[in-house]
Regions:
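Short, surface-exposed "cap/lid" segments of acyl-processing enzymes
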Residues: 45-47, 51-81
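N-terminal cap/lid segment of alpha/beta-hydrolase-fold proteins
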Residues: 24-45
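Accessory cap/linker subdomain of secreted extracellular hydrolases
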Residues: 158-229
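Short alpha-helix in the alpha/beta-hydrolase fold that links the catalytic acid
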Residues: 237, 250-261
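Catalytic active-site module of serine/aspartate enzymes centered on a nucleophile-bearing elbow/loop
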Residues: 276, 282-313
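Conserved alpha/beta-hydrolase
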Residues: 74-100
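Short beta-strand/loop motif that positions the catalytic acidic residue
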Residues: 235, 241-243
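Alpha/beta-hydrolase active-site loop
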Residues: 106-126
Length: 313
């Protein structure tokens, strides 16, 4: 074989291998409404279904990371469920990823997030019309999944670390564990009560603006109107609630309230899983390291809990 032929053969082989990789489809970029996402496809097997991931609150990107935390939890979960035979779609939220620099706080709204996820769900259904499409919501994302399921009728919903109470109750509980002086905690609770009554508070002290900026107050005001348990009771598609026993942000009694209100759903409590889906001790201070340790794997019981639900569909 001449050098030229060898070169051509090598080039063709590279193209063939690249096409094989694309056909196996490990990671495919996706884009809708100016937002970016990653489709992860199972290799060498027909997909059993497709799953849209809906991330938790704050500026969380498609991998489950934010400026304050890097866990790679959603990336790991997407890869693991792809290995189990499912297409997964992980997306950046408005305000994260490549377009973050062009977004102002006023652009981030509860209704806007909901519209974005509804558009991603439609994208998945149109792209894969012959397989079931599921919603997987983490933390606040579980509420979005619940609200979407009332209208768009996915094949099922997977609620991971979901709140079971309105966010005003969750916020008060979370704030009570922080080292605020009593007068500051009273002020915080008063602001939360006003938001629950759909009233904003002006002249927030600078030290609390990160919690109660004008934009966040408007966001919380909408969020607080939804009781996750009452909304889940309206859903008619199958669901599973997966709660972590060592979750210091959303305690297991949240999942217990959801399953009491909507008993047709499945329920799994993973005793040693925390809010970012890692295995940690019960002590919240000791578990802080998992919020910035992308090398730490997912809790080993999480993926089996999800696939048990999916395989029963």
């Amino acid at each position: 074989m001449t050098a030229v032929l060898r070169h051509c053969f090598t080039a063709l082989l590279i193209i063939f291998i690249s096409l094989q990789a694309a056909a196996a489809g490990k990671n495919i970029p996706a884009e809708i409404n100016g937002l970016n996402g990653t489709l992860t496809l199972p290799e060498n097997t027909a997909p059993k279904g497709a799953i849209l991931f809906i991330a938790g609150s704050g500026p969380v990107d498609r991998d489950g990371n934010s400026p304050a935390s890097r866990t790679d939890s959603l990336r790991m979960l997407g890869d693991a469920l792809s290995d189990a035979g499912y297409i997964t779609l992980r997306t950046d939220k408005t305000g994260t990823g490549a377009g973050a620099a062009t977004v102002t706080p006023a652009d981030i709204t509860f209704a806007g997030y909901l519209r974005d996820y509804q558009a991603w769900f439609d994208f998945l259904q149109k792209r894969y019309p012959d397989i079931p499409v599921y919603l997987l919501g983490h933390s606040e994302g579980a509420l979005f999944a619940t609200l979407m399921a009332q209208e768009q009728k996915p094949a099922g919903i997977i609620l991971v670390s979901p709140a079971g109470y309105t966010i005003d109750i969750i916020l008060k509980k979370q704030m009570s564990t922080q080292p605020f002086p009593p007068e500051a905690l009273t002020y915080i609770n008063d602001v939360i009560d006003r938001l629950k009554a759909e009233k904003t508070t002006d002249n927030i002290p600078p030290s609390l603006n990160i919690l109660f900026s004008p934009e966040l107050q408007r966001y919380f005001m909408v969020w607080m109107q939804y009781d996750p348990a009452e909304e889940l009771a309206k859903v008619t598609v199958p669901g599973v609630i997966i709660q972590g026993g060592h979750d210091c942000q959303i305690s297991p009694d949240n999942g217990a309230r959801l399953i009491r209100t909507a008993p047709d759903n499945q329920y799994a409590e993973i005793a040693t899983m925390n809010h970012v889906l890692k295995e940690t001790p019960a002590d919240c201070t000791a578990a802080i390291g998992s919020y910035n340790n992308p090398a730490q794997p997912l809790h080993p019981e999480l993926v089996p809990a999800i696939t048990r639900f999916l395989s029963g569909r």
